[in-house]
């Protein structure tokens, strides 16, 4: 069975149990009328959203598409929006069909809704008790939904998008926008209920007052009637009036006496009550003042103890800071001396810095604990003494308060003395506070100075480190320049030695009268080769070709002139003019010195290595660098002359 209910939220869900499907369609609704029903239709913001019918599950618990009636105009067509799976089938009456609910309910009423509603709800109207069809908690008459077309029959299954919708809306259609909101109706009903309750309460109070007044009035009437009505006694009304007046006068006199006595007693009671209240108030004030003084005394003692402990702690911190400052100064001086020794190049000395931490080794926690225990004992003792001294005074004051104003005056004097003592204690506390503030200010200044000096020392150390790095770089550069100059000096010494050797050999040859052989060759040739055996000398003159090769004999020397282009020789240099010095190296493998070695010997090697200054087999190039040898043509004339 399909049951539709209307709530304030807008959403739709479907549940399938066994073979029967139970569909709940919930949407924003408007309530009209009054009364409640167990079954029936629901009137939503879009019209009639559901009617009662039968449904059967087919293929799952719910549908994922959109369902609608298949056929002509129907009672309700719903476009759903909840994502569920499967389809359901149903047996519709008057255009009822199963729809796959998927949220976003949109109810559209067909033109035959009135007749269908009348036909379907006829079985339930008898249970409700009238032609009205209730919606939610309020009633609505089905005449709001007149029909202009006959009933229609829905198909057994809901299609993916539903069938055609019904005809135009009937003339009796009510726009939900014109209906009041449920919140407004509910608020109005609550306010009316509260007003009715208030009026009922006032009316009940008035009724009670009227009843009370009526009862009092009846009593007064009875009394008046008893006094004024004549009695049936034989004496007659005259004697009764005389007796009543006599008794009334007597009673009135007694009443006046009693009233006077009552007034006097009340006055005396009020006077005594006033005195008692004054004494009680003064006693309570004195007790309160005494209690306040005791509390202030204890508080002041605790504050003084705490202040003293704070002062001791601050003094300890100041001593520790002084020692730390001295230690920092010693470390700084040691570092400055180390840096100065490193910069000036003096001997490195090992410094041992010894810091005396004996004062800091004191167990401050134990000392503070002992001091705290000592002062707690003193505070307890002082509190007990003060209580012992004040307790008798309190008792005396309690006794003397009842004695009279003299005791009050004495108590005021004692209070004045206590106030003076409290003022002195307050002044002492203020003085200690000011002293504590000054000490804290000094500590702050000292800490600031320490931080400032530390920053300055750090900056000085960093600048000294930078200067030290610059000096190290300069020393490295000076060492490199010194090595270069030393290599140059060595090369010059070697060249000077070679020239000296050459000059000594020439002088020896001239002094011994050695001969000189001059050979001239014609044609193109790579160079001349000459050898002087023994202690003789040979001179080979070669045109500027690839480069000559000279072999010096034992004890002799070879001289090559105008070597061009760069040549390869045994102990021969590259460019320019080279001298090969034999003897001591054997087989012509002597040192070769180039005259242009100081000018970086173009094409030669570096100082002390490579071709310019190396002995043995080496590759050297002249200024032109591996240039092609020049071909020279000369006359075929050869002459030999011995001096």
UniProtKB/Swiss-Prot annotation:
Stretch list, region Coil 1B: 241-341
InterPro entries on file: IF_conserved (IPR018039), IF_rod_dom (IPR039008)
Entry keyword Cell inner membrane: no
Keywords, sorted A to Z: Coiled coil, Intermediate filament, Secreted
Region annotation Linker 12: where it falls in the sequence: 342-362
Region (Coil 2B): 390-510
UniProt-annotated stretches for the region Linker 2: 382-389
Sequence segments annotated as region (Coil 2A): 363-381
Region ranges (Tail): 511-643
Region (Coil 1A): 193-227
Domain of life where this protein originates: Eukaryota
Region annotation Head: where it falls in the sequence: 1-191
Official protein name in the record: Thread biopolymer filament subunit alpha
């Amino acid at each position: 069975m399909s049951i539709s209910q209307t709530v304030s939220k807008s959403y739709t869900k479907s549940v399938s149990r066994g073979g029967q499907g139970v569909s709940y369609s919930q949407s924003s609704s408007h309530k009209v009328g009054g009364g409640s029903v167990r079954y029936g239709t629901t009137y939503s913001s879009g019209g009639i959203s559901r009617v009662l019918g039968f449904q059967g599950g087919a293929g799952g618990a719910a549908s994922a598409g959109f369902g609608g009636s298949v056929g002509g105009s129907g009672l309700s067509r719903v476009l759903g929006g909840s994502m569920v799976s499967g389809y359901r089938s149903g047996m519709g009456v008057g255009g009822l069909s199963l729809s796959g609910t998927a949220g976003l309910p949109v109810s559209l009423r067909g033109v035959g809704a009135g007749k269908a509603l009348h036909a379907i709800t006829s079985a339930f109207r008898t249970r409700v008790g009238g032609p009205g069809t209730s919606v939610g908690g309020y009633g609505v008459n089905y005449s709001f939904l007149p029909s202009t077309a006959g009933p229609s029959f829905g198909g057994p299954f809901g299609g993916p998008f539903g069938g055609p919708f019904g005809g135009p809306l009937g003339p009796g259609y009510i726009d939900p926008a014109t209906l009041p909101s449920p919140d407004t109706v509910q608020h109005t009903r609550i306010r009316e209920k509260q007003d009715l309750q208030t009026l009922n309460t006032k009316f009940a109070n008035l009724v009670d007052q009227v009843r009370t007044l009526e009862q009092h009035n009846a009593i007064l009437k009875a009394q008046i009637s008893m006094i004024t009505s004549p009695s049936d006694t034989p004496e007659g009304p005259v004697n009764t009036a005389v007796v009543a007046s006599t008794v009334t006068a007597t009673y009135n006199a007694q009443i006046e006496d009693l009233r006077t006595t009552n007034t006097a007693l009340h006055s005396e009671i009020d006077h005594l009550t006033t005195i008692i209240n004054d004494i009680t108030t003064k006693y309570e004030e004195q007790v309160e003042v005494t209690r306040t003084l005791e509390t202030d005394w204890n508080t002041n003692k605790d504050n003084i103890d705490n202040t003293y402990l704070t002062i001791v702690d601050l003094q300890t911190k100041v001593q520790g800071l002084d020692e730390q400052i001295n230690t920092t100064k010693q470390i700084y001086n040691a570092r400055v001396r180390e840096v100065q020794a490193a910069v000036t190049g003096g001997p490195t000395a090992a410094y041992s810095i010894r810091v005396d931490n004996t004062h800091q080794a004191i167990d401050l926690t134990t000392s503070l604990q002992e001091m705290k225990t000592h002062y707690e004992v003193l505070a307890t003792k002082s509190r007990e003494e003060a209580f012992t001294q004040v307790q008798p005074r309190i008792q005396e004051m309690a006794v003397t308060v009842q004695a009279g104003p003299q005791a009050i005056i004495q108590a005021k004097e004692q209070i004045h003395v206590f106030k003076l003592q409290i003022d002195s204690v307050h002044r002492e506390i203020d003085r200690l506070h000011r002293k504590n503030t000054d000490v804290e200010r000094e500590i702050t200044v000292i800490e600031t100075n320490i931080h400032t000096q530390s920053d300055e020392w750090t900056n000085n150390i960093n600048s000294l480190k930078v200067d030290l790095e610059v000096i190290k770089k300069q020393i490295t550069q000076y060492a490199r320049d010194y090595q270069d100059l030393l290599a140059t000096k060595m090369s010059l010494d070697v060249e000077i030695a070679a020239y000296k050797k050459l000059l000594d050999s020439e002088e020896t040859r001239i002094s011994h009268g050695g001969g000189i052989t001059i050979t001239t060759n014609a044609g193109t040739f790579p160079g001349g080769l000459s050898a002087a055996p023994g202690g003789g000398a040979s001179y080979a003159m070669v045109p500027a070709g690839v480069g000559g090769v000279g072999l010096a004999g034992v004890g002799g020397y070879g001289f090559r002139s105008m070597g061009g282009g760069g040549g390869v020789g045994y102990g021969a240099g590259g460019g320019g003019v080279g001298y090969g010095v034999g003897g001591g190296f054997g087989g012509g493998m002597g040192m070769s010195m180039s005259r242009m070695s100081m000018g970086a010997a173009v094409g030669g090697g570096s100082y002390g290595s490579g071709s310019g200054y190396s002995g043995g087999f080496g590759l050297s190039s002249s200024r032109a660098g591996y240039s092609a040898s020049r071909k020279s043509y000369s006359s075929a004339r050869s002459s030999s002359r011995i001096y």
